[in-house]
């Protein structure tokens, strides 16, 4: 089984009942950042880009791309601190974030660059013209839910610290069985 192989590789497994894996990762990454540790999160999940900072980077194994703060801007058109707003507008089917129909990545990045934040976009929604403006106004009530779903919690109570999760020595015997 996979879990036994992971343990045999010297990788600590951490499971928290009733807690999203993203929230566990976010909590550990922010604790590591606070402790001055560099963190690399291997994922192609867009919502993890909100965690990127001077010590937290993402590695997308599918594209082979490493994302630091500048890489997030290059890929999504907004800095990491605007990724929650970007995801709220664009949505993400893999994380069940509905977003606003007809608002794609470029439109969301344009609005966030122009208005500065989701709150400012909402406050000035009547100024946004065309069909996409109509869609935004028609979906204003669902934005708080999308925002909540897009936000990775970084305050989950965990009994492990980042230092406890250092890579261990592989169990060669277990791996060759």
What kind of feature is each model-predicted range?
Residues 1-159:
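Extended two-metal-dependent nuclease catalytic cores across DNA- and RNA-processing enzymes
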Residues 161, 172-177:
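Long, highly charged low-complexity segments
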Residues 164-169:
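A glycine-rich phosphate-binding loop feature that marks nucleotide/adenosyl-phosphate handling sites
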């Amino acid at each position: 089984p996979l879990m036994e192989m992971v343990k045999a590789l010297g990788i600590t497994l951490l499971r928290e009942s009733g807690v999203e894996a993203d929230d566990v990762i976010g909590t550990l990454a922010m604790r590591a950042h606070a402790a001055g540790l560099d963190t690399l999160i291997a994922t192609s999940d867009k919502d993890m880009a909100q965690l990127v900072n001077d010590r937290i980077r993402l590695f997308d194994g599918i594209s082979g791309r490493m994302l630091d703060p500048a890489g997030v801007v290059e890929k999504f058109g907004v800095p990491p601190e605007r990724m929650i707003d970007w995801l709220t507008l664009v949505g993400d089917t893999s994380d069940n974030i509905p977003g606003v129909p007809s608002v794609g990545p470029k439109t969301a990045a344009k609005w966030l660059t122009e208005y500065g934040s989701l709150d400012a976009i909402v406050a000035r929604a009547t100024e946004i013209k065309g069909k996409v403006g109509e869609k935004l106004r028609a979906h204003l009530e669902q934005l708080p839910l999308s925002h909540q779903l897009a936000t990775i919690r970084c305050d989950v109570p965990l009994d492990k610290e980042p230092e406890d999760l250092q890579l261990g020595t592989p169990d060669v015997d277990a791996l060759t069985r």
